[in-house]
Amino acid sequence: MAAPPPNDGYGQYPPQQYGEQPQYPVEPAQQAYGSPASPPPAAASQHGAEHGKKKKRAYAAQAFEVATGGNAVVGGQPAATQYGIPQPAAPGFGGYPAQDAQQVAYGAPTTPYGAPQPAVPGVGGYQAPDPYYSQGVPPAAVGPAPGGVAGITAGIQSMGFGGQPQQPQQLPAQTRGLVNQLYPTDLLNQPFNVAELELPPPPIILPPNSSVTPSPDANCAPKYVRSTLNAVPTTHSLLKKSKLPFALVIQPYAALHDLDDPVPVVQDQVISRCRRCRSYINPFVTFLDHGHRWRCNMCNLTNDVPQAFDWDAAAQKSVDRWQRPELNHAVVEFVAPQEYMVRPPQPLVYLFLFDVSYAAVSTGLLATSARTILDSLDRIPNADRRTRLGFIAVDSSLHYFSVPRDTEENGETSMLVVSDLDEPFLPVPGELLVPLTECRQNIESFLNKLPEMFANNQSNGNCMGSALRAGHKLIAPLGGKIVVLSSSLPNVGYGKLEMREDKKLLGTSKESGLLQTANSFYKSFAVECSKNQVSIDMFLFSSQYQDVASLSNLPRYTGGQTWFYPGWNAARAEDAVKFASEFSDYLSSEIGLEAVLRVRATTGLRMSTFYGNFFNRSSDLCAFPAFPRDQCYVVEVAIDENLTKNFVCLQTAVLHTTCNGERRIRVMTLALPTTTNLADVYASADQCAIATYFSHKAVEKALGNSLDAARDLPQQKLTELLQTFRKELGGGSMGGGLQFPSNLRGLPALCLGLTKHVGLRKSALIPSDIRSAALCQLSTLPLPLLMQYIYPRLYSLHDMPDNAGIPDPETSQIVLPPPMNLSSERFVPFGLYLIDDGQTQFLWVGRDAVPQLILDVFGVQERTQVAVGKGTLPELDNDFNERVRNVIAKSRDHKSKGVGSITLPHLYIVREDGEPSLKLWAQTLLVEDRADQGMSFQQWMGMLREKVVQ
């Protein structure tokens, strides 16, 4: 198939283009070989000027030998050979002149460490642009770029990969028929570069004038809703033939607080909806009859425009309807009138269940929890002053606390102990859930005293099941959140659990049984809670077996989450800080209450399956007693009838009560073009959304079938895609290669990362609690965090570019070094590396790291003096230490990824010649290496090729 012209189709890139940046003008001969016409989203050229400003410290490095320096080349690098052995000069990759390999003694610097470098422009050094969708740009707008780096940068900026967010544009009429170009690539010869995972999805190219206003925000941004297909097949048979999944990845909130991610709010309570399908009016409807009526873009019914639609009741004057938010913005929030409420909006209610058994007291869990709640009372949402709190302590009995109002004279908090666990009665419910505002002082004094009350508790009993039933009875009339803080296995009363971890089962086909619930109480109780608008969050801290598999059912069906802190102990400062920070952010997060989510779509499309933490109340309604802001949901879409329109719409609506007691509906409308052409479907497929769908599907298999079935799923689906592409679009056999579209080039690495993930990989060394907690993350993490969890980020720090670790002059955001592929072949023995999967960070110190590096980063003379394990970097007065700390902090920054999260990852310091088990753990994150029964990336690709050729 003839290659299309290089820049045809906005935002498209020929296969080799990602990540191999020419540093010098490319000679024609090399250009013909297929070297890139433009690099990924880095506008690195202007940073040359920064080089001479500050004299940097000199450290040893072979940094600039083409194949060994971690940041020397990113893209199709040749694999590094044996550590430290001189290498043959590498070919000029992507137009780099070949460099002479110099023989270097480990310690001897060739180029000073961190000094001005003939550095490659940092690929991932700039954050990828805000991934907006585009409604297309005429080909003429993307002319051939002039030569050289400046030209390439200009070319990139015209393609919308510059530093500024690319605003979607209304499509000019002459570009009708513009589609994403299909660029086949050979997976074996044009390796994937990790920077591609941060690129925006293929643009959504709609027909001209699809929306009623030319607003750049008329279509939904990918941070809220992403489709696995940005061009939808018109028939079920074409979708089936493609073997691609059609699903939406939905994350209604991109931050924990509204202020961090405001969306337009329609305050006037005029909500225009279709009479038949109940869709909300949106930018893709059509107005008829001089604007008095509108045609629904989902079911085609004609509806009347409400009279108040063009009238501002507050100001008593007519308004310009074209300014209304719901016609200009795909994501809006309507303030709901009375008919959207079953009862008055509920207040925010938190009921804390404290484990006060010996385990919880001795590890410091009780004291740290009480202290954190005390310190966070001002952060708990309470703008309407209706927020209520309640406290129950749990060992082999239930301890209720009745907190008096601050106005009561000599008001003392009283404790009531109930030992009858079969029918725990509720003493004085009115005094157990108290308004935060009216009882603030007494709540503070209670939290101060709580740890002392149980300081000498020797009980090992934990009747958490009975406590949950009592708590449910207490808050069911109002609804709200039950927050469980537990560090032992529930072993008495309702829902008691046995120690069932059996090392002999790990790594065998029977292991899956350990991931399923051991007591039906947890699932049936969770469904009961969901009906009464009660959500449960679990914070689990055991150093022993805790049966996370059973306990995680409670959050799974009530819109909650499970947080697991294995081996946690407050005596370790890092443990105490991590939990206190996460728990405080959790308490401060805004949540929706009494929420339901529904997805409607153009006639012919049907929502077939829903994945995520909620209860599926009917075929298309998902119920959330509380709606969190740090989770995503996946909805599979079926094509039931042939699609006749040239674009379809999918509208997600979340009806909820805000923390301030206001009933609202958040509406997100996504429009996608349709196509009859298989090549268009493949060219517009979104690899990150597909990997997210596979992740949710694999977790469902792990919990419902077996771990083997879960592991096989990504491999089987990927093989089907490769076979289909080869047969239908690959032009036959194509010699020894493995053909796939360039926009899906990262999918094999993501699928390998998923099968080797701690939640799924075959191993006899993974405790079932660790596995169960990982499955909770794999099925809830927002897409950007999930990609990093499956395929972690690896940064080389000892030779990072000069602009890394310092603020970008334009955005003032810290610049990260370019990410590297997860292979130990990229490591040099004198290197310093950061491996980060978003939950845990590892700082890897090479076995030959030079003393100056050790001194500057850790403040000690000898490598052997570097303390390994959980830790924090000392703040030292030198440039390089500050840059390394900045990179570690920036890598943890969720806001810059466009998601809300409370997670504060632990940092583990790993010496290559240090603690073997720690080193082994860090190495399991190197997805492309062979480890613990898992194959290397090369073996994986070889196996896929064999399966495809068969």
Curated annotation (Swiss-Prot):
Residue numbers binding Zn(2+): C274, C277, C296, C299
Localization terms from the record: Cytoplasm; Cytoplasmic vesicle, COPII-coated vesicle membrane; Endoplasmic reticulum membrane; Golgi apparatus membrane
Keyword entries, A-Z: Cytoplasm, Cytoplasmic vesicle, Endoplasmic reticulum, ER-Golgi transport, Golgi apparatus, Membrane, Metal-binding, Protein transport, Transport, Zinc
UniProt region (Disordered), positions on chain: 1-58
GO CC annotations on file: cis-Golgi network; COPII vesicle coat; endoplasmic reticulum exit site; endoplasmic reticulum membrane; equatorial cell cortex; Golgi membrane
CDD domains: Sec24-like (cd01479)
Main localization, broad class: cytoplasm
Record flagged with keyword Cytoplasm: yes
Molecular functions per Gene Ontology: SNARE binding; zinc ion binding
Topology with respect to the bilayer: Peripheral membrane protein
Function: Component of the coat protein complex II (COPII) which promotes the formation of transport vesicles from the endoplasmic reticulum (ER). The coat has two main functions, the physical deformation of the endoplasmic reticulum membrane into vesicles and the selection of cargo molecules.
Family of the protein in this entry: Belongs to the SEC23/SEC24 family. SEC24 subfamily.
Protein name according to UniProt: Protein transport protein sec24
Organism annotation: Neurospora crassa (strain ATCC 24698 / 74-OR23-1A / CBS 708.71 / DSM 1257 / FGSC 987)
